[in-house]
């Protein structure tokens, strides 16, 4: 009898729950179909409120964007975990969002919950925009021409040492999970060039574990619940505290021994002062160094992996790279001297290969800004409400046949007769030196506007030296009859090749190994 009553109660509750869910879905559909405000951008149709288009967007953002553009045009809104995300695609969309006025759009409210626990307090998105612009200026002036020139031999040595000592490249030929290998190479090159000798010496097993635990803090759920007591968040917080301690120890040691100063990024930041006269606090220096390590390594690791995968899928291009170096750099047509900064400008195919891979494989597919005031969209009847989030996707123009014929094909040679010029009329100073707004171009691998990446020049130097060194010493190829490259993994905040991404390798000169 008791069992029967329990079952009846359960059935009744289930019926009420089902009816309630059905009512919510019906009301959601009616609102979409009957009550649309004509000044609102079109809303992507969805069945379930709150969830909206979260799944389809998360599985393949670019497929989602292109599909929606066919149905709704360049401007549309979709629901992402209860948030109203207004997407504006194309060059005009990039301009509207990435060069939006500070009073109208805000990046800090979007990214601070995600980045502050990883990078640290009082920097980047955890401070007023004016302070961030000063911090970007400090970093930018640490990336001087002389500094970039000095980085080339350091980066080349790190790559050569890795090829000689890593178990991934033991012997004269083999197979390698290339995303793991490039993650290690890029953290070593960036660590040595940007972080200084003390930090590079600390890139041991402990530092790798700390980096891994911090990196796992960049998970989509932390956009919504950065404080959630998840195991990965506890590890993230512990890793941040330990990494900050490491940098603080280095800074304190240098202050005790000023005669041993070396001209690297830590030295540069230790001598920086805000406009109000306050020296850059040591805690902020430590947090900025963590940011440099994390932010730069993500994109370099991803794009260098894609480069190696593309070269493995088309070995003939790898040979073209090698022959370009022989033609342009070899004194005798056989041997190659150590790389120098000026050599990179003599290798157009190397540069074009990097550009083309960046075009196809941007690691960040969505750039978001919180709307602070209603924003009329020029040339349209739409007004973006203040409770929306704006989303720009520069990768969409880079993947469009309108701007790049046969855009889905990887072709480094397409850049030989193409020049991407900065619009001199759009030069602006946001507080960290003059830059181009950049949004008039369909190719924006490093973003645009006040939040444009300041590490662009270093990224090209780092990738250029890595590619040139690999081409000198290695041959790459696909294995097991595989064609092309792996699919893109969009499950993390920074997209990259799906794993496992295994390719074959052999040394170009095995007798020298």
UniProtKB/Swiss-Prot annotation:
Which transformation does this protein catalyse, written as a reaction? a 14alpha-methyl steroid + 3 reduced [NADPH--hemoprotein reductase] + 3 O2 = a Delta(14) steroid + formate + 3 oxidized [NADPH--hemoprotein reductase] + 4 H2O + 4 H(+); a 14alpha-methyl steroid + reduced [NADPH--hemoprotein reductase] + O2 = a 14alpha-hydroxymethyl steroid + oxidized [NADPH--hemoprotein reductase] + H2O + H(+); a 14alpha-hydroxymethyl steroid + reduced [NADPH--hemoprotein reductase] + O2 = a 14alpha-formyl steroid + oxidized [NADPH--hemoprotein reductase] + 2 H2O + H(+); a 14alpha-formyl steroid + reduced [NADPH--hemoprotein reductase] + O2 = a Delta(14) steroid + formate + oxidized [NADPH--hemoprotein reductase] + H2O + 2 H(+)
Query: Which pathway features in its UniProt record?
Result: Steroid biosynthesis; sterol biosynthesis
TM region positions: 10-30
Q: Where is the signal peptide?
A: none
Q: What is its EC number?
A: 1.14.14.154
Q: What CDD domains does UniProt report for this protein, alphabetically?
A: CYP51-like
| Gene Ontology molecular functions | heme binding; iron ion binding; methyltransferase activity; sterol 14-demethylase activity
Q: Which Pfam families match?
A: p450 (PF00067)
Q: Name one GO cellular component term.
A: endoplasmic reticulum membrane
Biological role stated in the UniProt entry: Sterol 14alpha-demethylase, encoded by cyp51A, cyp51B and cyp51C, that plays a critical role in the third module of ergosterol biosynthesis pathway, being ergosterol the major sterol component in fungal membranes that participates in a variety of functions. The third module or late pathway involves the ergosterol synthesis itself through consecutive reactions that mainly occur in the endoplasmic reticulum (ER) membrane. In filamentous fungi, during the initial step of this module, lanosterol (lanosta-8,24-dien-3beta-ol) can be metabolized to eburicol. As a target of azole drugs, plays a crucial role in azole susceptibility.
Name of the featured protein: Sterol 14-alpha demethylase
Q: Which organism is it from?
A: Aspergillus flavus (strain ATCC 200026 / FGSC A1120 / IAM 13836 / NRRL 3357 / JCM 12722 / SRRC 167)
Ranked from the top, the taxonomy reads: Eukaryota, Fungi, Dikarya, Ascomycota, Pezizomycotina
């Amino acid at each position: 009898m008791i069992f029967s009553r329990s079952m009846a109660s359960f059935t009744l509750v289930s019926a009420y729950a089902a009816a309630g869910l059905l009512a919510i879905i019906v009301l959601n559909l009616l609102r979409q179909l009957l009550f649309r405000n004509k000044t609102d951008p079109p809303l992507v149709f969805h069945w379930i409120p709150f969830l909206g288009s979260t799944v389809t967007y998360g599985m393949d953002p670019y497929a989602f964007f292109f599909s929606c553009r066919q149905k709704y045009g360049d401007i549309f809104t979709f629901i992402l975990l209860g948030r109203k995300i207004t997407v504006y695609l194309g060059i005009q969309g990039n301009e509207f969002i990435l060069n939006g006025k500070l009073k109208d759009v805000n990046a800090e409210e979007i990214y601070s919950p995600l980045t502050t626990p990883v990078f640290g307090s009082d920097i980047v998105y955890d401070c007023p925009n004016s302070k961030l612009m000063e911090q970007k200026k400090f970093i930018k002036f640490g990336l001087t021409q002389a500094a970039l020139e000095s980085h080339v031999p350091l980066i080349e040595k790190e790559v050569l040492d890795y090829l000689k000592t890593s178990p991934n490249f033991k012997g004269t030929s083999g197979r390698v999970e290339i995303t793991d290998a490039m993650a290690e190479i890029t953290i070593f090159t960036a660590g040595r060039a940007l972080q200084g000798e003390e930090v590079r010496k600390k890139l041991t097993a402990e530092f790798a574990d700390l980096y891994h635990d911090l990196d796992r803090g960049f998970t989509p759920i932390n956009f919504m619940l950065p404080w959630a007591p998840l195991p990965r968040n506890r590890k993230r917080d512990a890793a941040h505290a330990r990494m900050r301690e490491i940098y603080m120890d280095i800074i304190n040691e240098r202050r005790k021994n000023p005669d041993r100063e070396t001209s690297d990024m830590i030295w540069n930041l230790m001598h920086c002062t805000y406009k109000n006269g306050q020296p850059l606090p040591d805690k902020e220096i430590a947090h900025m160094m963590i940011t440099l390590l994390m932010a730069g390594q993500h994109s370099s690791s991803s794009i260098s992996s894609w480069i190696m995968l593309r070269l493995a899928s088309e070995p003939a291009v790898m040979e073209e790279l090698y022959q370009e170096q022989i033609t342009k750099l070899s004194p005798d047509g056989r041997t190659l001297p150590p790389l120098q900064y000026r050599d990179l400008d003599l290798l157009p195919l190397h540069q074009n290969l990097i550009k083309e891979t960046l075009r196809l494989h941007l690691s960040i597919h969505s750039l978001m800004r919180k709307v602070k005031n209603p924003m009329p969209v020029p040339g349209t009847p739409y007004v973006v409400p203040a409770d929306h989030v704006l989303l720009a996707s520069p990768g969409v123009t880079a993947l469009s046949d309108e701007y790049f014929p046969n855009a889905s094909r990887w072709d480094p040679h397409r850049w030989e007769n193409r020049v991407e010029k900065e619009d001199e009329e759009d030069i602006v100073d946001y507080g960290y030196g003059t830059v181009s707004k950049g949004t008039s171009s369909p190719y924006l691998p490093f973003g645009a506007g006040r939040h444009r990446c300041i590490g662009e020049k270093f990224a090209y130097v780092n990738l250029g030296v890595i590619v040139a060194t690999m081409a000198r010493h290695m041959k790459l190829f696909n294995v097991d009859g595989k064609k092309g490259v792996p699919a893109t993994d969009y499950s993390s905040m920074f997209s990259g090749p799906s794993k496992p991404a295994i390719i074959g390798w052999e040394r170009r000169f095995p007798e020298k190994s």
